[in-house]
């Protein structure tokens, strides 16, 4: 018994920390939304992002990068600021890395209406 108690006391020190991945919780505009040209596109993640390893592209219906859409990382938010977008379908292709250093990728589309 004298040997078991010290060993049990050390168990919490051996367990690694529990990390969650940086999952996309929601976006503005939402996936499949039909909106007027947005002034910004905001992605809300489940944890703060590592700015050096996270980012996004805004693509038009032909898969071309829409220029002028800088990306800002602010904690769990990823914000794209495109210029005025003509009507059409757009796709946001994102990748995120949280504090656990695991990369997640995803995308969603929305439509800019006339």
What are these model-derived regions, one by one?
Residues 69-74:
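Short beta-strand segments within Ig-like beta-sandwich modules, predominantly Fibronectin type-III
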Residues 41-66:
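Short, surface-exposed alpha-helix to beta-strand junction/turn motifs within ectodomains of secreted
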Residues 86-95:
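A glycine-anchored, Pro-Gly-centered beta-turn/N-cap motif
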Residues 79-83:
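Exposed aromatic-hydrophobic patches
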Residues 2-8:
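Sec-dependent signal peptide recognition
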Residues 27, 36, 40-47, 101-114:
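Extended, polar beta-sheet/loop recognition surfaces of beta-rich domains
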Residues 10, 15-17:
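N-terminal signal peptide c-region/cleavage motif recognized by signal peptidases
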Residues 19-28:
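Cleaved targeting-peptide boundary
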